[in-house]
């Protein structure tokens, strides 16, 4: 593939921007993965890797996870803050604290811990805190405890502090502080406290409700003052060491981030005036990733990079400290999405394709109903040289005629054959109009979009949107989706992707199309009998954890892929995926009981013994098989 062709494909799918140097198109037109862009020779052809794994028994759909990307993301964020601190002359430290709610899988937590980079962990529930405490011995860093807390949660955090860990209990509700002080006294431990301030500043987009004055968590200004006085009265004011705020997840606009940090810096200054020695400034989450590759303020993009993000935070805090003669605090960010999103690709196979095929139309019978004659006359006029009717007018006329035919069919005025003829002719007319449209003509764009959606191939993909990409369904989040091969060809076709659940919501509605978003996906020409595998990229944050069991489709298989500079690749199975039996047990349906009931029914039939045994074996094999479709 020429460099010009490769460049065109990169632009079509915006790989150069959302891929962030981890994903590219190689000379074969295949997706290649470079888990560590600092070691460019260490890369793998993803299409070849998947096919090799399939030959060894790998089932699809499957998650292909690249732990080296996790580690590179962690290094990159740490490096950005190091550069920002050096540029400003900032004296405080920086810690990235990973909120495990983003992806609690062991492979993710341990890959980050073993990176050799400074790393803290954040918990938002008792279960998460137990996981964090169990891994804390490997980090010897910071633990931040957020979320609603009961007595057991608080005791666990204080036990961690008693064991020598640096555990910050962030007060998010005034009711928590009394329990903290009681349990700290019982355990004879000095608590290390934080306070989450509820800011007026708020981001925009799909996650804006997690920040601002109406947010679920945090203390208002009057409550912050009340907390300070409560601690002062208890002789524990020195325990309040961390200031925390959260603007929202996936902040698209750097100006919103800068505004929020400046407001929170005022809290830092005012708390020092009250005698509170705040040592850590936790700016929470918000560091976004560019799912679209548009470098914009849209909900699924960001208009900044790591360096600009780090600079805005360090300079805002540093300026506030310099203005008021205060020490530079340790800066903490809870950057889970930015660390994990890129490292996982869901790969699946297309199990069926429904294409709109075009045939040379034939004239209707002379005595055909008027609506059929009108449709045919429009078709003939489209092919007359010098016609002055617009493309839009042709399209509208044909749509009206087809609408009349559909209504007439319902009342018995048209036969099934006549309806089929009309629909096929209409498709041919749409195809003819589509060929004459100019994408550079702004007036044509609405018609192009309408026809692309109408004429797109329907691809039925072996996956559950609700299990593997729940945010695409729940909040209409966009994820990069494209074939793993065939990217050396011009994307002349369009497609929409449908999952295998029995739900009309199981469809992807938005796709990357150059610098914009479309309702259909660009596709290179392909063999409908042997369609390419598809990759769903950047699904490493939240998707595995939020996935649900709609239609009892379970977790997919997952493998960890390690790529080395000499070209060698190591693949480890990290999750075998759920069986049908696993999913049935989730809903209190015991597989053994079901098998017994089925056996009893089979025995009551008049089938011969051999056939009874065959059916029993098939039923039992299905119970312990994959929940997704499998090849024979």
UniProtKB/Swiss-Prot annotation:
Cofactor(s) it depends on: Mg(2+); pyridoxal 5'-phosphate
GO molecular function terms noted in the UniProt entry: arginine decarboxylase activity; metal ion binding
CDD domains with a match to the protein in the record: PLPDE_III_ADC
EC number of this enzyme: 4.1.1.19
Binding residues for substrate: 281-291
This protein's UniProt keywords: Decarboxylase, Lyase, Magnesium, Metal-binding, Polyamine biosynthesis, Putrescine biosynthesis, Pyridoxal phosphate, Spermidine biosynthesis
Pfam families tied to this protein: Arg_decarb_HB, Arg_decarbox_C, Orn_Arg_deC_N
Gene Ontology BP terms: arginine catabolic process; putrescine biosynthetic process from arginine; spermidine biosynthetic process
UniProt modified residues of type N6-(pyridoxal phosphate)lysine: 101
Catalytic reaction annotation: L-arginine + H(+) = agmatine + CO2
Organism domain of life: Bacteria
Signal peptide: none
PROSITE patterns: ODR_DC_2_1, ODR_DC_2_2
Protein's UniProt keywords contain Lyase: yes
Keyword Nucleotide-binding: no
Functional description taken from the UniProt entry: Catalyzes the biosynthesis of agmatine from arginine.
Family statement drawn from the similarity comment of this UniProt entry: Belongs to the Orn/Lys/Arg decarboxylase class-II family. SpeA subfamily.
PANTHER family in the cross-refs: ARGININE DECARBOXYLASE, BIOSYNTHETIC ARGININE DECARBOXYLASE
Name listed for the protein in its UniProt record: Biosynthetic arginine decarboxylase
Organism name: Salmonella paratyphi B (strain ATCC BAA-1250 / SPB7)
Lineage, broadest ranks: Bacteria, Pseudomonadati, Pseudomonadota, Gammaproteobacteria, Enterobacterales
